[in-house]
């Protein structure tokens, strides 16, 4: 299998990235990668904790040159890092922060001089079969499990994404992301998507609506935003109109058609959703205002058996059993009906937590909300519970709205108003976080 270049489709004077309000050229990036690669220890595995997206990419690229595998766990808690240290004894940490982890030797990201006037080294090529990263399941379906990602698979994914989303119509677009690069969605769509298609990446990761608006407004057009439903909902809840954009991309949970239409109108840009998982990477897309169906990427085949739905082919190098209930419409289009583990059966009636969450979050005034089915506990009756962030609404108002949307057997008992939900950096709610919510509720009630 052929090699693939580290970066692709950049002219000599092209802007490669934006950082601290200033453009970074291709020459600077290639010099930074070469310099950092020369300083990395001779190890097999690297834990790249750089929060700055540009520095993360320099570290990821330098590791590729040294044939090192980047470990990308779902979180960076001390317990998980200790677990990685036991599982991969030679792993070391690259960070641009001040924290050191006792279990790991640490390399602090150095400051490099300005190389803009120096001739850059040539763009290196990386073997397609080289293992570039080890990504881990998010923890929302159990304990993290590692999955290898080859450089060739990652490159094919990034190029297929750009083609599907029509980004050739926006040469030089700057991609701003609200998701971290250490997660599969962030790696694919805020790091590899721009660098394999001649686009510019943005180094920062704004979180609050005002910061997202400010960072996006400061960028030249064309500009795109890669985000999550949580960030998007918070942005649109603000009275301030967001800056115009040329492209919106969302993932980690399905959007409602209403929210998607509102986003397209407010940003004056098309919004696309990505469906995927850590195990397979990105699998399908849809433009939510046009269709509920998802369309698989070229080359990806879906098949079903008694175990569920499998995805393989294209950039998905090993066939993967998807964790969702999927209705195949034809060879490459399908509908999602929630996660397999989310099916709820009460009084002979069936639905999914995803469907219930959809209706809960479609209520005007609900900023965030989630249904939870607690684990059965002895002889006590297990009831659906909902946790809702809605500062302007009462629990009674929300319950009345739910009665208009869902069968009464699925109404939450209780419905708990909270200040915020414990989402992780990509907007997901890990199983352990939901368990703690329910446990704390039971402790207060008991």
Question: What are the residue ranges of the model-derived segments?
Answer:
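Gly/Ser/Thr-rich phosphate-binding loop
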Residues: 237-291, 301
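Conserved C-terminal "lid"/linker of ANL adenylate-forming enzymes
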Residues: 344, 371, 385-387, 401-446
